[in-house]
Amino acid sequence: MAMEQRPKTKIVCTLGPASRSVPMVEKLLMAGMSVARFNFSHGSYEYHQETLDNLRQAMLNTGMLCAVMLDTKGPEIRTGFLKDGKPIQLKQGQEITISTDYDLKGDEKTICMSYKKLAQDVNPGMVILCADGTISLKVLSCDKEKGTVRCRCENTSMLGERKNVNLPGVVVDLPTLTEKDKQDILEWGVPNQIDMIALSFVRKGSDLVQVRKLLGKHAKTILLMSKVENQEGVANFDDILINSDAFMIARGDLGMEIPIEKIFLAQKVMIYKCNFMGKPVVTATQMLESMIKSPRPTRAEATDVANAVLDGTDCVMLSGETAAGAYPELAVRTMAKICVEAESTLDYGDIFKRIMLHAAVPMSPMESLASSAVRTATSSRATLMMVLTRGGSTARLVAKYRPGIPILSVVVPEITSDSFDWACSNEAPARHSLIYRGLVPVLYAGSARASIDESTEETLEFASEYGKKKQLCKTGDSVVALFRTGNAIVIKILTVK
């Protein structure tokens, strides 16, 4: 896929049974995948390890970078097991008892749920949703002594084993990081040098402080992405965003907790706030859901993806479409095409003005230079921006101002003695930039013996050659470079040789 067709918006793919072989992962990388999501709600460590090894092999084979995201299971509430393991038929108007004794095998009269405080936390008149909201149970009475809740079924449906449960409007007394999550992060995530953790059911800013404490020295190299999936999280959104490195709009559980007709607004407001803080945001859940079975998305899905791009999302995400669908590669290609089309309609000048309007005054020197570089690129009709960076923060600030052209983020190693220690100083910032719209990271090996000025010239030359190779610019084009030399930071307009 030629580089000009790759959208600026990044695509996150969930790897699963349909997409974990080396050839398939290679296809997804070529089609436009930038981040691979490992969903720890399912699968053993061995299973995920095999998938990760295959991903790394595919990255080597294609020479493409891909970030690794661990998505935690979080404090889920589930229904229990059923007699003989057979689904039960629930009829509208039928009454049923919910027990909090999880050893109970359920039937048509009694089922169990994994949340011990259910009888204390719900009140008559409230609704309990099961199996992604396909079953709605109205609470009639609660027996706190026995830990049981009497409900009436609001609709007719089949209930299988271990289905997810939502309690709209209830402040659930469960930790954001369960013991399983801690184990997943420390025993699988950290040793495998993952790039980011998507935290399920974040409810307040202090949740993130605890996770950083848990990560210790690794907190520097692992980004924390918050998923707000209930009313408490929505209420504390600003506090959560300040404490997060990135954000995911997980519309699935959110759609159970807040009225479905308000989801569009929640999405727009959250993206808007993330954009102004320069924090990357992922829009997720059911984006091309019908492509699990069909080679074409519905018109509504195509419009949904395009609208997320117009709203300002940095990434769009595929879940079941790539994990278990019949057309994983086609889903990514379709998504990329829709993103390219949506991006071509944006008024980048207007977006720049809007972000400048909301920028803090006074701006930090670095941010002031980043926004000036974007303005320079626009007025000089440059086709590419090149940012030389070590930790990646300069390139990320440039991306915040949303130039209409790609930003080549050239990650230069920090020289420690004579060896280049890529692992600690470099690959992480390059992969982290894979969740920012418009950033194209590239690793530059550089020559250890050159002086600062020579090495800057060499790096710029390398960057323009790379840009030409990837069809981001051509001979005679203007490009704007932003780099540090000595104590000065320089914005330079170059002509591609």
UniProtKB/Swiss-Prot annotation:
It is an enzyme of class 2 (transferase). This is Probable pyruvate kinase, cytosolic isozyme. GO terms for cellular component: cytosol. PANTHER family: PYRUVATE KINASE (PTHR11817). It is found in: Cytoplasm, Cytosol. K(+) binds at N39, S41, D71, T72. The record marks K227 as: Transition state stabilizer. Pfam families: PK (PF00224), PK_C (PF02887). It comes from the Eukaryota. Belongs to the pyruvate kinase family. Key regulatory enzyme of the glycolytic pathway that catalyzes the final step of glycolysis, converting ADP and phosphoenolpyruvate (PEP) to ATP and pyruvate by essentially irreversible transphosphorylation. It catalyses: pyruvate + ATP = phosphoenolpyruvate + ADP + H(+). ATP binds at N39, F40, S41, H42, R78, K163.
